């Protein structure tokens, strides 16, 4: 098999970043390379094509890695996607399509089809590409999960893949984490370890070298590179709303526009904020504080994995009252997908997609009543890549939802959704990544809020910034981890 696995000593060790940079570095050499993550757990996903050309879901990181590899993203690059709807329950997406739900206790005996699908997806990629760069999940040293593992060492052993182990030194304890991981692995798994990498290092590498030499002596593992801390680098968010990432490189001194994003407990597809955070002159915060939400020029209510649960939370926290006051004062609000549904008048869930109780027994639920919209949940999920226009600007987005919004006939339209005064709503994710649309919408927001902000015509577009970030990662791989790059190139089939 023409592949390798990048595993981590923990979650957020930097696996996704390194795989992104490695894919671009390999692609620069004219090699057809594909990313792969057997199982991802995230409520932030992207709509791509399945093998039959139909729409399907994968994690945002694998979508970005496919862009880095300069190939079309497919559902095989993330065949199993778990989308948590509670602490003990996840919606399962299998090769891009809804598969069902799994409770925490059901996972151990219900993962057989997931393993089968993930292996079939890897084999399809291995046949279609010269190299497959795999990303692990969590840590391979979770020995309590080893028996059924198909994401880390289980994947590596099944396909005979060498493993590069990544540790995050910025958190502290990286040397111990690498040594502990090595020590906990079975001997057959240890033999697959090709070496380790240090990620997010600040300072003089010579200070670190004695520790690396000792670690190599005790484990026999070579150091494949030391990646420095990289400013201005981000990844499309996997699980949480992150404040101000990516932020503008230089804070300009001109007029400002403030955006407050509601930190919903069950937020999904939070990447809608990334392009807003990168816009010059925009100050973006993610918050639950009513005073900050009341004061902002724009409030964004993002997508939700549990619209009904988050609607109840909005009321319980008093944020619903803040939104009502803003609407009454013609102060801008934007709702996206679940946030849009919550801003509407009613939500019906006869199939029990979100509401508890037997299907068909759920009563009509009142929304916040700020938009002339009525939402009906369907058991079947809607996936798509819609296009439209607003104020003469072509707009492309993507949609992932069970709720179908019915807009009143006499309502003012906003993309696929509605506008009432200064309240806007749409089911479409990803629209803010379109530079012309984002700038036009924020200009409208500034006019409504009385802000003097205007877009900077000289600023780089969001897509250009993302490409520059990918190239920064690839440059770091080439400069600081040549041994990792050599390992990858040696696996080209």
Regions flagged by a language model, labelled:
Residues 353-354, 360-384:
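Conserved P-loop NTPase catalytic core
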């Amino acid at each position: 098999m023409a592949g390798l696995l990048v595993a981590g000593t923990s979650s957020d060790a930097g696996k996704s970043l390194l795989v992104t940079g490695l894919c671009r570095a390999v692609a620069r050499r004219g090699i057809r390379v594909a990313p792969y993550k057997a199982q991802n757990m995230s409520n932030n996903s992207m709509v791509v094509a399945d093998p039959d050309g139909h729409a399907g879901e994968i994690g945002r990181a694998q979508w970005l890695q496919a862009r880095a590899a300069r190939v079309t993203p497919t559902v095989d690059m993330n065949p199993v996607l778990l989308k948590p709807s509670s602490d003990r329950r996840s919606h399962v997406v299998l090769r891009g399509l809804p598969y069902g739900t799994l409770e925490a206790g059901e996972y151990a005996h219900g993962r057989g089809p997931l393993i089968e699908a993930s292996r079939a997806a890897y084999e399809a990629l291995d046949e279609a590409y010269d190299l497959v760069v795999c990303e692990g999940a969590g840590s391979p040293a979770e020995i309590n999960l080893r028996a059924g593992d198909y994401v880390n060492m289980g994947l590596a052993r099944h396909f005979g893949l060498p493993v590069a182990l990544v540790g995050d030194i910025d958190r502290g304890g990286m040397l111990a984490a690498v040594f502990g991981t090595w020590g906990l692995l079975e001997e057959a798994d240890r033999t697959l370890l090709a070496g380790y990498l240090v990620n997010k290092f600040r300072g003089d590498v010579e200070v670190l070298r004695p520790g690396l030499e000792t670690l190599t002596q005790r484990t026999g593992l070579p150091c494949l590179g030391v990646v420095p801390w990289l400013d201005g680098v981000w990844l499309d968010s996997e699980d949480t709303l992150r404040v101000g990432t990516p932020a503008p490189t230089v804070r300009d001194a001109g007029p400002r526009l403030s955006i407050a994003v509601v930190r919903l407990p069950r937020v999904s597809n939070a990447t809608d904020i990334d392009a807003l955070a990168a816009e010059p002159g925009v100050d973006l915060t993610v918050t639950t504080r009513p005073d900050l939400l009341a004061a902002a020029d724009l409030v964004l209510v993002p997508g939700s994995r549990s619209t009904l649960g988050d609607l109840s939370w909005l009321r319980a926290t008093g944020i619903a009252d803040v939104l009502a006051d803003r609407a009454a004062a013609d102060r801008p609000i934007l709702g996206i997908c679940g946030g849009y549904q919550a801003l509407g008048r009613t939500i019906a869930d006869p199939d029990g997609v979100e509401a508890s109780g037997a299907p068909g027994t759920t009563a009509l639920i009142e929304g916040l009543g700020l938009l002339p919209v009525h939402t009906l949940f369907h058991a079947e999920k809607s996936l798509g890549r819609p296009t439209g226009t607003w104020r003469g600007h072509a707009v492309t987005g993507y949609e992932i939802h069970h709720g179908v919004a019915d807009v009143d006939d006499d309502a003012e339209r906003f993309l696929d959704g509605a506008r009432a005064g200064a309240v806007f709503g749409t089911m479409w994710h990803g629209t803010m990544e379109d530079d012309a649309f984002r700038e036009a919408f924020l200009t409208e927001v500034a006019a409504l809020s009385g802000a003097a902000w205007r877009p900077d015509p000289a600023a780089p577009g969001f897509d250009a910034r993302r490409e520059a970030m990918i190239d920064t990662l690839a440059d770091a791989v080439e400069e600081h981890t040549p041994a990792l790059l050599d390992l990858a190139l040696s696996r080209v089939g």
